[in-house]
Amino acid sequence: MLLNPDQILNLVRKVYEVDIKQFYSQLRLKNLRGLLDHAAHLFNVYLRDLEINQEMEALTAFIIGCYYLYLIIPQSLQFQTRNNLYSSYAKLKNDYQDEHVMGYVLKVVRDESTVIVDRYLAESNGICRTIKRKRAYSLPLRPLPVHMASLSIHNKFDGSLHEIPNELTKPTNDNSKEDIVRESNQIASSNKLEAGSEVAYYTSKEALSKPSYLKLSTGKDALFKTLSSPATAPPVHSLEVSSQIRDSSQDSSSSLSKVEKPKEEEGKIEAIESSAPKAYNLPVIEDSNDLLSELSITGLQNPCNTCYINSIIQCLFGTTLFRDLFLTKKYRLFLNTNKYPKEVQLSRSIYVLFKKMYLNGGRAIIPNRFLKMCKKLRPDLNIPDDQQDTQEFLLIVLARIHEELSNENVVKYYPDLVSYDANALQVNPSKYEKWYERNVITDGLSPIDHIYRGQLENILKCQRCGNSSYSYSTFYVLSLAIPKLSLYSFTSKSRKIKLEDCINLFTGDEELSGDNAWDCPNCRITDSKSKKEEITSQKKKSTIFGFHSRSRSKSPHHHHHHHHSSDDSTKNAKKRNSKKLTTIKSLDFIVLPPILVIHLSRFYYDLTKKNSTVITYPLILNIILKNGKVIRYKLYGTVNHSGNLINGHYTSVVNKEKSHEIGLNRQVWVTFDDDYIQQHRKDRNNFEAGKTEMSSDEVYVLFYERMDEENYEEEFC
C-alpha cells in the first residue's frame, strides 16, 4: 500500500480526531506503566498485522502507538517523575524509530503532537494552575551564622532576571551558541601542572585514541521480581585487600605526577562466622599534599562525542552514597551473577572506572571499559560517535544498575525500603498499602532505590460531589518544566525565575474542567438508553476506531485507559457539562530520597529547540513533605549544557569536598570539561562573595544531597 504525503497527513489527523482527541485529557492522568504497556501492545499489533498483510490495520496501530510515545506519555502526569520505567520508554521509542519504512509517518505524528501540545497549553479555559501550597524554598529556617553569610558559585549571567512565573514557557530555537569549538576542550599545555595554577590541563591529543568496540548486542533483560519473603541473612564476609599492586585495569591513563599511585587487587571474599557488622572500606590513597590526588580530582578524556557521559560520570562519582557502593565492593552482595554474567555487568564496569578515578587524582583517563560495556548493552546509542541527552543516559544507567542489583538481600541492608507508616506519611492507608506492595513486587528492590527513589501522591478531587481518587508513583529524577513570566500575578520586575518556582509549579493545584476534568465515577450518569445508543453508534464508527477498540480490548492493561469516557453518550456529556464538572488535581511529596536529582526540561520534541531561560538555584534547598516535615538539601553538583542537543556540549561542576560541605573556606568546587579541569578558589570567580544561590541559562541537571538536622548545625555553626 502506497500513500502520498498528503494522504498520510490526512490519515494521521483522522486517527487523532477519532481515536485520541476525546481520550487525551483522561489518558494524561493514567498510570505510566499502563500507558507504556499499551504502546508496546500496539507495536506488537503493528508487527502482527504486517505479517498477515493487513497494511491499513498495521499503519493505524503504528500511528496510534506514535501518539502514545510523542503526545500522551510525555504529557502524562507520571512522566515528570522519572524512574526505571524511563528506560523502558527509551527502548520502546527506539523500537518505533527503527521501523525505517515508517520514518515519515513517525515524523508526521511527532510534528502533529507538537502542534497539539501548543494548542492545548494555549487554551486557558480548561486548565488553571495555582500555587496555594509552596513546597520548596531556599532560605534556611533560621538566620545564617555570620561566617555562613558568604556562599556562592561563579555566576556567568550578569543581565537582569525575570519575575516569578506561574505558567509553562515554550522553548525557542536559539542558535547563538551552536558553534562550539571542540579544540577548546583538549590540550592547552603539555602534561604538567604548574604549582598554584587554577586550571589543570590533562593529556595530549595524541592520547585520545578511539577505542575499538565490541559488536555483541544483548536482548532486553527483565526486571527482578519476587513474591517470596527475603531469605535469612548470609554470614558476614571480610575483604582482604592487597595494596601497592599495580592496577591491571583496561582503562588507560596519562600521568601528571611522578608519584606512583598505590594500586588495589581484586579482593578475596571469605566467609567467617561473626556477629560483627560488615565493614566496607574505601581503597587507600597514598598520603599526599596534592589536592588533586587527595580529593580524587580526575579528568575523563573524550574520544569523540562522550561529553554527555563524562559529565554524568563526574556527578555520579561525586555522589558519596553511589560511589562508595562500588568502591567498597558492597555492590557484589546484591549482584545476580547467574542472570548477569561478567560479560554484561555494567556494575562491574562502574566499579573499575570509579576505582581508577579514585586512585588517579591529578590524571586523566579514558573510560574504555565503561564505554565498551555501554556500547554492548545499548548499541542504539551509537557510542562514542553520536551525541545523546545526558539525563536520559543517567536514567539508562540507574535502571540497568537497578536490574543487576535487585536482590532479596537488599532488604537486610536497606530495611527502609520495605517499612513505612501510612499514618505518619498522611496518605490514604488502604490505597497506599495496595500500591506499595504491588510496586515493590513488580519493580524489585535495589540499592538504587535507597539512594534515589522518592514517592509522590496525586489526588483528583471532584468539586461537585467531593469524591477523591488517590494514586502514587516513584521517581529517580524529577523532570521539571521551566515556567514563563507572569505579567499579571507579580509586579516586581526584580523577582527571579527560581528552581523553587519550578518545584512549586510542579506541585501546584491544577483545576481541570470540561473535557479535561476527571471522569468521576460518582458523577457519571448511568442512563441505560444512552448506553444502548452509544453501543449502537460505536458499531457505525470507522474501521480505524474499531481497530483501536479491538487493540485496546486485547491489551492486558486496557483497564488503565479510557473505559470511563467510552460510557458517556453525547446526551450525557451535555448534562455533565451543564453541571460544570470540575476537578482539582493536587500533588505532594510523601517521601524524598537521600539524593535528589532534578532535571530542567529545556528541550522540546525535536530536540533542536532549547529553552535558554535563566534559572536561579540555591546552595540550600528546603522541600516540605505532605505531613509538614521539612527536608533540607545541599547542592553538590550540576550538569550544564551549551548549544543545542545536536550541536552542543556538556560540562559538570562538582563540590569535591569529601562531605560536600559548603561553609566558609570549606567548599571545593571544580568544573569538569572532559579532561580540562578548573578548580575555583575563594579569591577568584566570587565563589564566596556573599551569595547563597547561582544563576545560569545552561544548568540542566542538578544534584542535591539530603542534610540531617545535626549535620546542618555542625556544618554551619
Curated annotation (Swiss-Prot):
Q: Name one Pfam family in it.
A: UCH
Q: What class of enzyme is it?
A: hydrolase
Q: What is its EC number?
A: 3.4.19.12
| Active site: residue positions | 307 (nucleophile), 649 (proton acceptor)
Q: Which reaction does it catalyse?
A: Thiol-dependent hydrolysis of ester, thioester, amide, peptide and isopeptide bonds formed by the C-terminal Gly of ubiquitin (a 76-residue protein attached to proteins as an intracellular targeting signal)
Under PROSITE patterns, the record lists: USP_1 (PS00972), USP_2 (PS00973), USP_3 (PS50235)
Comp. bias regions, Basic and acidic residues:
258-268
**Protein name per its UniProtKB record:** Ubiquitin carboxyl-terminal hydrolase 11
The species is Saccharomyces cerevisiae (strain ATCC 204508 / S288c) (Baker's yeast)
